[in-house]
């Protein structure tokens, strides 16, 4: 037994040092380092602890054999992701934890920005994934006014924020996964509210400070459009912009900056409040919503990364549709298997919720306990992976066909019906998410290959993967509008977490072209959340180049090729084998 344990731990350490196996590159935000090694080894121990001590044997076997994926097992004692109330931070200050240094509420812009950085860094240690604030520009604008700041002074503080959030600050040598949502135009639900400065309400209203909000937006965009000294993009915070009816007519000078950043790096995420049925005010609605109607699914406020105030997810389980299609052989048996594994997912999420509530009550999440106190407004999240491959397996046609579209729409609607039943049974919130599946799609494919001879997979024999959620095959088309049309109904069937990435071979020629494209997508489709994602390359010596350039044309050195892995920009060299193959096979759109 001792010899076996020694060999197991030796293999575990060697796996990371050699960067071998899917677990070694499970998260491209974690950089190769001693801290990464410690994270890798401890994550394996904590993951095993969770599977054997928290979850049922049925859930453990379903996960181990690839029927489901229980996300972030290393963080099984804490929640998945969270959106926070910036207003509460500005009112209360930073602290509330016994034995830890506390600060008074911010009286000045520089202090407020510093508190945001502190808060995100600390909360990222208490949760598995993304941490988000909404209305960053609106809520901090009054501080700029009362401090009588020049634009240069605002720029300096925003520059500090961006650089601070791009430094590793958690085990695994990870940058804090953070999102800031910018209103662009003062949000109607905040416009008539009294501003918070220095921990107290003042007589002034937020609608009076659009000019200062514009300064904050300009400063942020001018920082990120330059990148770092070598031309690398800033991965975090992920900026989300709310596209409302006046979005394209407001802030003339900032429009050019925003779409220069979009054309060059593709950093901004766009939340579509024009073509979709989303409500901009819902971002803060969960804070005071005490009585949920569990007879229907509600759309989770925010989006995949930018969760609404005081909401988020306690945990995520993804279902392997490809495996169920392979074993089911026909649609009726497929649905029966789906129902079975949805129940297993539900049971595991109910366990997770109880564990997180206990962790918070016992002080394992001390800052979350102070600022949140409960996860009653946090969702239990279920997602799917391999929808395209499931179509091929069941009906011999992929997701781009009418038959494939019909099958997956029926599947998603069936899942939603089951989630309503779960809500009625548990009195907890459930949602259906197009989960990112950064490592899950590769892990599922490896296990499908192991257990299911002849099963349909994307990629190659050496680097297989499943297509994310119910997305189109990555090599299906370079026609953007065809792809958008085929994703319109599918993406709006989910209740959270959908993103459509407009992948481009290189940056767009000018900002006006980017603006026109974003406007057209927002006005003519129902897609809730989308990005423009150009490919670009960075040489440590000679800077940035358009498109995929693996060798620097000036010095001949290796470059870093950048694109989005499921939702954030990272060098392709940091991706796992499955996602790397997906990048190689992907057709970029012509615009």
Short names for language-model regions:
Residues 540, 555-591:
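Long, charge-rich boundary regions
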Residues 130, 321, 376-381, 566-572, ...:
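Generic secondary-structure boundary/loop-capping signal
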Residues 391, 448-463, 568, 572-575, ...:
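Contiguous hydrophobic segments
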Residues 154-158, 162, 393, 570, ...:
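Metallocofactor- and cofactor-centric catalytic cores in central/energy metabolism, strongly enriched
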Residues 378, 382-391:
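Extended amphipathic alpha-helical segments enriched in small hydrophobics
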Residues 2-376, 397, 401-554, 558-561:
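Conserved catalytic cores of very large enzyme subunits
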């Amino acid at each position: 037994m001792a010899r076996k344990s020694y060999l197991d731990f030796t293999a575990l350490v060697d796996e990371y040092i050699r960067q071998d196996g899917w677990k070694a590159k499970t998260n491209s935000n974690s950089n190769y380092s001693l801290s990464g090694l410690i994270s890798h080894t401890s994550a394996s121990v904590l993951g095993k602890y969770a599977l054997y001590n928290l979850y049922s044997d049925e859930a453990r076997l379903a996960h181990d054999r690839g029927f489901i994926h229980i996300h972030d097992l290393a963080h099984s004692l804490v929640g998945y992701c969270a959106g926070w109330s910036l207003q509460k931070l500005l009112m209360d200050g930073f602290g509330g934890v016994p034995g830890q240094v506390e600060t008074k509420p911010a009286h000045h812009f520089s202090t407020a920005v510093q508190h945001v950085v502190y808060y995100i860094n600390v909360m990222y240690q208490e949760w598995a994934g993304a941490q988000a604030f909404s209305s960053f520009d609106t809520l901090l604008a009054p501080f700029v006014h009362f401090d009588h700041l020049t634009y240069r002074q605002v720029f300096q503080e925003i520059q500090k924020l961006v650089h601070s959030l791009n430094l590793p600050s958690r085990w695994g040598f990870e940058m804090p996964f953070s999102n800031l949502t910018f209103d662009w135009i003062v949000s109607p639900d905040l416009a008539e509210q009294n501003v918070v400065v220095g921990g107290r309400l003042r007589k002034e209203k937020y609608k009076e400070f659009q000019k200062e909000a514009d300064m904050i937006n300009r400063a942020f965009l001018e920082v990120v459009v330059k990148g770092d000294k070598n031309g690398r993009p800033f991965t975090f915070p992920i900026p989300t912009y709310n596209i409302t009816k006046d979005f394209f007519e407001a802030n003339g000078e900032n429009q050019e900056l925003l779409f220069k950043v979009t054309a060059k790096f593709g950093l901004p995420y766009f939340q579509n409040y024009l073509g979709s049925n989303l409500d901009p005010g819902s971002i803060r609605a969960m804070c005071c919503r005490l009585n949920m109607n569990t007879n229907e699914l509600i759309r989770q406020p925010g989006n995949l990364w930018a969760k609404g105030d005081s909401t988020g997810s306690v945990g995520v389980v993804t279902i392997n549709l490809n495996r169920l299609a392979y074993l089911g052989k026909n649609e009726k048996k497929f649905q029966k298997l789906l129902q079975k594994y949805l129940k297993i997912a539900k049971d595991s999420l109910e366990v997770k919720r109880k564990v997180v509530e206990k962790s918070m009550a016992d002080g394992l999440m001390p800052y979350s306990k102070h600022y949140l106190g409960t996860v009653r407004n946090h969702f239990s999240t279920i997602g799917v992976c391999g929808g395209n491959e499931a179509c091929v397996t069941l009906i011999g046609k992929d997701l781009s066909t009418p038959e494939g579209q019909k099958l997956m729409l029926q599947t998603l609607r069936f899942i939603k019906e089951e989630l309503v039943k779960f809500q009625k049974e548990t009195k907890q919130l459930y949602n259906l998410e197009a989960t990112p599946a950064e490592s899950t799609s590769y892990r599922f494919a490896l296990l499908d290959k192991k257990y299911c001879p002849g099963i349909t997979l994307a990629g190659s024999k050496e680097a297989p993967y499943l297509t994310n959620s119910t997305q189109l095959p990555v090599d299906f088309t370079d026609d953007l509008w065809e792809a958008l049309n085929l994703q319109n109904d599918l993406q709006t069937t989910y209740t959270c977490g959908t993103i459509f990435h407009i992948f481009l071979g290189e940056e767009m020629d000018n900002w006006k072209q980017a603006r026109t494209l974003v406007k057209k997508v927002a006005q003519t489709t129902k897609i809730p959340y989308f990005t423009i994602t150009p490919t670009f390359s960075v040489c440590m010596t000679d800077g940035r180049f358009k498109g995929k350039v693996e060798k620097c044309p000036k010095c001949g050195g290796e470059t870093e090729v950048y694109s989005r892995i499921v939702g954030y920009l990272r060098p392709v060299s940091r991706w796992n084998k499955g996602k790397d193959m997906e990048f190689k096979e992907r057709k970029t759109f012509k615009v």
